[in-house]
Amino acid sequence: EQDINQMGGVWKKLPYTWVLMIIGTLALTGFPLLSGFYSKDAIIEYAYLRGNTAGYYAVVVGIFTALLTSIYSWRLIFKTFHGDYNNNKLKIDTMHESPLVMLIPLIVLAIGAVFAGYFFKELFIGHSSSNNFWIDSIKFLSPLSLDHPPLWIIYFTPVIVVLSIPFSHYL
């Protein structure tokens, strides 16, 4: 079935897929300490540190898109895995977990989502790192400030993402 409105309550039949989807959703929405947190927040923080109109515009757009991403991702989890099963064509009893050939790639991706952000953050962000492998891939018109962004910039997006979870449940 491709209509998520006809799904629901399948987490008991697909427990591994459910856990892997939760991990992927947490990473995609930028949950702290997962891979999406480091990349998304680094972009927003660096945009703020530009200190100009384009940078502030990028911050607003980045935070807004993080909010939308969180809402649609958690809506997918709630509609697909929780709630009532509404499909009259396919009986829930016939549903089963995916074979290992499909689960193994998902497990590898979930491991990367959990650990890659932490282990490779210095490579991508460059804090106290002498390895500037990615430095030429990011072009700036002028050097960034060495200041740190204010705390509200650091904490605002994760707070918005967490607050969007109950909101997306009711969509």
Residue ranges and their predicted role:
Residues 33-34, 66:
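Extracellular glycan-interaction patches encoded by glycine-rich segments
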Residues 27, 65-68:
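Residue-level hotspots within pore-lining transmembrane alpha-helices
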Residues 40-41, 70-74, 78:
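Alpha-helical transmembrane segments of polytopic integral membrane proteins
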Residues 24-33:
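Transmembrane alpha-helix interface/packing and boundary motifs in multi-pass membrane proteins
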Residues 26, 84-87:
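Acidic glycine-/aspartate-rich tracts in secreted/extracellular proteins
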Residues 1-4:
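Alpha-helical multi-pass transmembrane bundles of energy-transducing inner-membrane proteins
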Residues 6-19, 38-65, 87-171:
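Membrane-interface segments at transmembrane helix junctions and kinks
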